[in-house]
Amino acid sequence: MARFFRRRKFCRFKADGVKEIDYKDIATLKNYITETGKIVPSRITGTSAKYQRQLARAIKRARYLSLLPYTDSHQ
C-alpha cells in the first residue's frame, strides 16, 4: 500500500538568511496573504514565530501605505 508523503515545512526567511522583512518588498509579501487579503498563518506556511511577527508587521505597514489592499476587489 502506497503511503502519502507530506513535504516538511520550513521557514524560507531563515533558510535564505534574511535579517529583517521589508514592507516595501511587495512581491514577497503577496505570497503570505490570501486572495481575500488575510495574513496566512505560520502553521500553513511554515514560517518561524520570529519571522511571522515581522511578516505581519510588514504587511500591516504596507496596507497602511496603500501598497497592499486590506481586502479583495469585490468584483
UniProtKB/Swiss-Prot annotation:
GO molecular function, one term: structural constituent of ribosome
GO biological process, one term: translation
GO CC annotation: cytosolic small ribosomal subunit
Top-rank taxon, per record: Bacteria
InterPro entries xref list: Ribosomal_bS18, Ribosomal_bS18_CS, Ribosomal_bS18_sf
Assembly and interaction partners: Part of the 30S ribosomal subunit. Forms a tight heterodimer with protein bS6.
UniProt protein name: Small ribosomal subunit protein bS18
Organism lineage: Bacteria, Pseudomonadati, Pseudomonadota, Gammaproteobacteria, Alteromonadales
